[in-house]
């Protein structure tokens, strides 16, 4: 039976969500973002009489971000995930986009193997931490852009987006870039609101010295508590110091492919 890749429609939602329930130990997030992704466009399904796989693409500044690849467990190992990725790559090439990125759990060996078979390589490794909001006044941070060229991306709603001069200026004007430089190497963070989950703060952290990082963490906790955030999600390439309010959740590989 022929399979086709097409744009998702709202009536696909029930059948798609039926195989997006137990992806992670805690469940899945597709049900929470389906409506957003559908309205954004580039939400794709692969069907064999009915949808057996789904994937979303987000195009921005000469890159495509591939997210939410899910395949019905009864149809895995048939190349459907690869078909979805290739379809998105073709869309990107039509837009003359040069790079494709996706994020994969370091322990998800089948997905890593699939990505490598499509000529993706490991670009960076990132750690995800959750932090509890709490009133904490033991901090002294500053606002402003002190990032160097090694900071290539920041995280916005779990998409790794390019940090170019225009973006840095916009974030700086909005006071979204904070730093602490009291002790040795400067630590810097970019704070943004999740576009898909209420009262969730997403932090991209570039950690310098441990004391500077702890200074930023204290500020972020206090800022979140004062502004009634429920969750703080920190993404960083570094290992963070131990705190009882800070929990390491998962480590990801950021995969990249240059599109010709």
Question: Which positions does each model-derived feature cover?
Answer:
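Conserved GNAT acetyl-CoA-binding A-motif
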Residues: 92-107, 227-236
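A conserved beta-strand-loop-helix scaffold within acyl/acetyltransferase catalytic domains
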Residues: 21, 27-44, 53-69, 190-198
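Conserved catalytic-core motifs of GNAT/GCN5-like acyltransferases
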Residues: 59, 103-104, 121-135, 247-260
């Amino acid at each position: 039976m022929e399979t086709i890749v097409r744009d998702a429609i709202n009536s696909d939602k029930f059948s798609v969500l039926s195989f997006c329930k137990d992806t992670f130990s805690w469940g899945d997030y597709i049900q929470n973002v389906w409506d957003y992704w559908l309205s954004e466009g580039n939400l794709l399904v692969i069907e064999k009489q009915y949808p057996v796989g789904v994937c979303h693409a987000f195009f921005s500044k000469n890159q495509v971000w591939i997210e939410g690849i899910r395949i019905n467990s009864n149809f895995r190992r048939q190349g459907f995930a690869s078909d979805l990725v290739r379809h998105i790559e073709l869309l990107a090439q039509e837009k003359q986009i040069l790079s494709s990125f996706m994020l994969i759990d370091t322990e998800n060996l089948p997905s890593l193997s699939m990505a490598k078979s499509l000529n993706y390589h490991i670009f960076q490794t990132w750690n995800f931490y959750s932090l509890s909001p709490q009133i904490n006044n033991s901090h002294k941070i500053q606002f402003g852009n002190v990032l160097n060229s090694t900071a290539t991306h920041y995280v916005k709603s779990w998409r790794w987006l390019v940090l170019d001069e225009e973006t840095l200026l916009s974030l700086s004007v909005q006071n979204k870039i904070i730093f602490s430089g009291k002790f040795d190497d400067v630590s810097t963070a970019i704070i943004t609101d999740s576009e898909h989950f209420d009262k969730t703060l997403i932090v991209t952290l570039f950690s310098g010295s441990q004391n500077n990082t702890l200074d930023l963490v204290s500020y972020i906790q206090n800022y979140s508590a004062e502004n009634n955030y429920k969750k703080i999600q920190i993404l960083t390439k570094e290992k963070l110091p131990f705190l009882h309010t800070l929990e390491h959740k998962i480590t990801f590989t950021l995969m990249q492919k240059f599109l010709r």
